[in-house]
């Protein structure tokens, strides 16, 4: 992590650091310590950028405080849950880290997002 941050921290295209994507630890309440530890490394090595991670279980990570540890809670999929979970987060910042494939087809975005599967894929 230290080497990664040192290598890219002067790159203007880096807007935040990501410490993981859909890690199994997100389900375990005690594993917030690991997320906090990785985030602290990022802050120590580059105090100018926030830290996120992609979490694919928004209800679980909000209820067990895993998302509350992050500077920016990154939610993968389930955009219909963003609003309710946003209100529960102390930092009140949410990033849709992986979303397009679940709510669009070939660049066509439909809002508000309805909670149902697509009838067909183009």
Can you name each region flagged by the protein language model?
Residues 1-122:
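Substrate-binding/catalytic cleft of secreted carbohydrate-active enzymes
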